[in-house]
């Protein structure tokens, strides 16, 4: 729960980086909506303020992920005029694949993974991951990076909805309240 809540502090870093690097500040009246969305995700993810050294390390990694996601978002927005969407996405995904290839090669064991598992991983990489990130980058070209990033926080709400539809899981009252708070926060920013 910590990592999910911390990773979705990314809208804060996107908003700060957009103002700093892109000279696209967020009006002060909209900061409350950003904070409300982040708080809603924390409630939705059932954030519990517990602590241990191991949890602190994981929390630090999650914070690094949030900052990196923020910088990725701002970098994508900054390149909107320089490259067409699919050219930009192709370079980003190609370089990411090259970066991950050594780790994948070291840990690949053909005796463990059959062709069905490999096809499933490739399919997940191309369809939901590739299409989702390409649509996210398309949104970054059209709206303030914070707006696109706030909508991305709804991955968590989408996961809850999929849990209801596919697994019959009933969300807790705090999950429902958290999802509603995120939607109100997004509404305050966008409207």
Where are these regions (language model features)?
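Structural signature of hydrophobic alpha-helical transmembrane segments
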Residues: 1-10, 55-68, 116-129, 180-182
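Helix-helix packing/entry segments at the starts of transmembrane helices
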Residues: 3-9, 75-97, 129-165
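Hydrophobic core positions of alpha-helical segments in small-molecule transporters
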Residues: 6-9, 29-32, 57, 64, ...
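Hydrophobic residues within membrane-embedded alpha-helical segments of Major Facilitator Superfamily
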Residues: 13, 36, 42-43, 61, ...
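Transmembrane alpha-helical segments that form core, pore/gating elements
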Residues: 14-16, 34, 50-108, 121, ...
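Hydrophobic transmembrane alpha-helices of multi-pass small-molecule transport proteins
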Residues: 16-17, 26-47, 100, 122, ...
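Hydrophobic/aromatic residues within transmembrane alpha-helices
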Residues: 20-22, 26, 79, 88, ...
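Membrane-interface helix termini and inter-helical loops of multi-pass transporters
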Residues: 45-57, 104-121, 164, 168-173
């Amino acid at each position: 729960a910590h990592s999910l809540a911390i990773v979705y502090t990314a809208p804060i870093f996107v908003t700060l980086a957009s103002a700093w690097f892109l000279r696209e500040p967020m009006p002060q009246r909209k900061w409350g909506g950003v904070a409300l969305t982040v708080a809603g995700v924390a409630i939705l993810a059932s954030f519990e303020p517990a602590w241990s050294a191991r949890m602190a390390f994981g929390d630090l990694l999650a914070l690094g992920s949030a900052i990196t996601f923020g910088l990725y978002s701002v970098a994508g927005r900054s390149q909107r005029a320089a490259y067409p969407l699919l050219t930009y996405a192709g370079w980003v995904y190609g370089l990411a694949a090259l970066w991950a290839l050594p780790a994948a090669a070291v840990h690949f064991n053909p005796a463990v993974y059959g062709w069905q598992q490999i096809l499933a991983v490739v399919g997940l990489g191309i369809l939901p991951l590739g299409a989702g990130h390409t649509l996210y980058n398309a949104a970054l070209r059209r709206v303030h990076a914070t707006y696109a990033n706030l909508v991305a926080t709804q991955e968590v709400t989408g996961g809850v909805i999929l849990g209801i539809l596919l697994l019959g899981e009933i969300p807790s009252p705090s999950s429902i309240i958290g999802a509603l708070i995120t939607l109100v926060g997004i509404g305050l920013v966008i409207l």
